[in-house]
Amino acid sequence: YMLELKNLVFSVTLKDEKNNDQKIDIIKGINFTFEKGKFYAITGPNGSGKTTMAKLIMGINRQTSGHIFFEGRDISDLSITERAKLGISYSFQHPARFKGITFRDLLAIAGQTEDEEKLLGIVRRMGICPLSFLDKPVDATLSGGEIKKIELATTIARNPKLAIYDEPDTG
């Protein structure tokens, strides 16, 4: 399997109305395998744990218990950076905006290339007009849809083994 979740649990501790600690399970005992080369969509209502599960897989949050296996290797205790080096990539629901950096700069960093044709190819795959968009600054002047396309394009540019897209159609 590409990815396997075994008894995955994520809990938080909150204070109740009497200021006592109360443990709440956000993710409770998930077992699932993801096969290589397939596309999976995880759906559910707001607050059902979709983003939490994505962040657990990427290592942004740490599971309370259970294990995450990537290509047969237990990655449960690996950092975000170590998981990224293994080929896991995460596209945020609300991407960051940067002052003083262009879309071209971000793509070159993500794709580890400054080859104009490769960058233009990635931009075209996103349905973006490359000539007018490539040198735009990635800042507050961009719409939500534009910043989301930039986020998705940089994920594609990294050419990951496993890409996790959190709400790819928002923005």
Each predicted region: which residue ranges?
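Catalytic Walker B motif of ABC-type/P-loop ATPase nucleotide-binding domains
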Residues: 163-167
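Q-loop/switch helix immediately C-terminal to the Walker
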Residues: 94, 100-118
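ABC ATPase C-loop
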Residues: 155-156
